[in-house]
Amino acid sequence: MTAVLAPAEDAVRVPWRRAMLALARIEAVRFARHPLTLVAVLLFVSPWVYDLVTGSTDRYPVLHDKVVGLQLSGLFILGGGALVVANLNALRAHRHRTDALYSVLVLPDPWRTAAFLLAPLPYAAGVTLLAAARIGALALLPGAAGRPDPAELALIPVLVALLAATGVLLARLVRSAVVAPLAMFAFAVAAFTVLVAAARGNAALRLLQPVMFGDLPFALPADLVDRPSLRHLGYVAGLAGLVAVAALFRSGARGRPVTVAAVLVSLVAAAAGAAQFHTDDALRRAAVTATDNPAVQQACHRRGDVTYCAFADFTAWIPGWEAVLQGVRRAVPAVTGPPLAVRQRVWAHGYPTGGSTSSSADETGRNTAWERAAEAAGTPAVIPVGTRWGDDTSEAVFAAAAAHRLMTGSAFTPSSMVCGARGALLVWLVGQATPATARGLRKLDAASSGALAFVDDTTFMGMVVPDRDAAPGLSALGRPPAEVGALVTAHWTELTDPATAADRFAALMGVPIAPEQPEEERTVCTA
């Protein structure tokens, strides 16, 4: 009997750590080869492949915002797949009715659970390479702006590891393969609910959700981004560690190492989560300066007779601005006035979020301060441009601002209304500048009602042209550009006179115009 029991006594001495690592390697291969893992990776990269094949890649990506987009797809696509696959792998013995066989193996249940927790880590490392390759490819584009935050990039594999650990924990809590997909669905619903609440101004929810979105609907220079990325990474990593320790505890792991690990990851999650709420006064002051007096934070470049001033992150966009501005100028005769200048503008501080609004007095004060600062910096009557570029409507809005400056010699004020022949001429100048501005003009016209609106969402600055006045300009785009351009040059002074009616523009161009509305229904022009 003693001879029979001796081998079992030796078996107990088999090093569990080595056995656990061997099992983790096998499970890592199974994890990577699982069909759901492959489908998740294909879904993750499919938008990149589509952009490459169709040529629709964003030519002006803001890199630090693109990383946040990757976090979102990494959370729901790669992370969701990891949750389900990790859960299925941890439940394999139960699903195959082989639970009893594990009782005769030398590796205890907590160590097997640790192997399942380690198995997704090589996959997470591969996710890191995928995300870095995507951001690297975008950074090579000539129009790339901003710079990626390494902590935000590192968050993507941590999110995958967090959800994979959640899948293992669910397998130890409920022995059913249905639970993981249901949990992922519930998580998606909860995440959407939290996102809506955060968009309404709940800063706590914005910081405590796995993916930390910005609270502004447009890009900021990287130095002004209010996202505590490193602290948020520590917070999510702490959550992942806490879930992993919970899975080990549920598997029967006890003792001082488990207790110490639980305390440490809890402290990391709590400390990093709380640290996210620390406000940075220097960042707030920089945002105020960027809003009211951006010249001190910008670099200016002279291209021909035009000065272009932009935040350092966005200087790569200057050639795009120049192409649109020169497209507008091509149809304009030489005019006198201050030297042309383009200056980037961003509403980095005080932007209304969470349902709040900005009063007209506040907007007037902010715009007055900005115009005075621009003039003090040597760029009077500057043409403003925002931090959104590359889409057709943004280029059309900038073309409208440039056309207004060339017609009037002054920068437009917020909510300017351009009427009469000026309005028709402005619309034509926008449409003929570049193919992108022509497409943007059509989109803006389709979305407008009562007046054609050129509004920059990043600054709330814009102008509107009443539909009756805009219609002749749109119709003139159907005529040969050279013929219309010659007429514009010959009658420039008349067409840019605020007293000239749109009927005169229509008569000169030979295009129709709608009958004048009754006087009580006419739009009152303010510019």
Language-model features and meaning:
Residues A124-L173, R345, G409-P498, D503:
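Alpha-helical transmembrane segments and their short interhelical loops
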Residues V45-L52, L129-R134, F185-V196, S266-Q276:
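Aromatic-anchored segments of alpha-helical transmembrane domains
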